[in-house]
Structure formats: C-alpha cells, structure tokens
Amino acid sequence: MSLSGKDKSVVKAFWDKMSPKSAEIGAEALGRMLTVYPQTKTYFSHWADVGPDSAQVKKHGATIMAAVGDAVGKIDDLVGGLSALSELHAFKLRVDPANFRILAHNIILVTAMYFPTDFTPEIHVSVDKFLQNLALALAERYR
C-alpha cells in the first residue's frame, strides 16, 4: 500500500503534534507488545526486567519512537532511509519481521489513547499506512 501525497502530509503534521509525547507512546506501545505478545520477550532476554514499567522498556520505547520520527523525515524513501536499521534487525538482532507489524499496531492503539479527539479516522488510516510501510522497509533486508 503506497502513501499518497496527502497521507505523507497528514503523517508529517500529526507527527509534529505527537512528537512531544512520542517517548511515552513508544514506552507504552512496547510494554503492551511485550505483555500481550509474550513471545516478543525473547529478544530482550538480556534485560533484568521486561515489565511494561521497567526503565529499559521505557528507554527502548523512546528509542523506537525516535527512529519513527527519523522515518517521518525519510517518508519519501523509507527503504533507502531505513536500510541500516533493517540490516541491524535482520542480521545482528535477528528480529522476526512480523514483530514490526505487531509493534505498529500497538503504536496505533496507544496513539489513539493519547489523542482521542485528534486521532481522526483520516489520520488513523494515514498513520497506519505509514507504519505498515515502515514495517515493510524494515523487513527489506530479510529477502
């Protein structure tokens, strides 16, 4: 599913609104993923605590959302812009690419909770398309 010019504009504008809360959104989204999809905890077995309130989950959630913000800036070439991150996840971290979609779903959920009025159906569809394209770009090096 490709991103239209309108989708890109909507995503950029909404990112400007949500970016001040992005670290919190990322922490909660990652914490939810680790709780609801416990098989994802295997990637973080080196952490002392993978609970949703742990400092490591909060820190990595913020790191994830910083990368999402970086991807917003590279929205016209997600595959090229995220090549190094894709390579890291494919060859070093060996993350199952299905987990990118799971995390994207959780980011959508938490974003809707943080912005119940602003996260309109139009914004929802554009952000969802963006996150799905981001997940595909991250999975690119797995081929």
Swiss-Prot record:
Positions that bind O2: H60
Pfam families hit by this protein: Globin
Expression by tissue: Red blood cells.
Binding of heme b, residues: H89
Superkingdom of origin organism: Eukaryota
SUPFAM superfamilies membership: Globin-like (SSF46458)
Example GO biological process: hydrogen peroxide catabolic process
The UniProt record lists the keyword Transport: yes
Cross-referenced InterPro entries: Globin, Globin-like_sf, Globin/Proto, Hemoglobin_a-typ, Hemoglobin_oxygen_transport
One annotated GO molecular function: haptoglobin binding
The entry's keywords: Heme, Iron, Metal-binding, Oxygen transport, Transport
Entries under PROSITE patterns matching the protein: GLOBIN
Gene Ontology cellular-component annotations: blood microparticle; haptoglobin-hemoglobin complex; hemoglobin complex
Globin domain location: 2-143
Signal peptide region: none
Family of the protein in this entry: Belongs to the globin family.
Assembly with partners or alone: Heterotetramer of two alpha chains and two beta chains.
General function of this protein: Involved in oxygen transport from gills to the various peripheral tissues.
PANTHER family, per database record: ALPHA GLOBIN-LIKE-RELATED, HEMOGLOBIN FAMILY MEMBER
Protein name: Hemoglobin subunit alpha-A
Organism of provenance: Seriola quinqueradiata (Five-ray yellowtail)
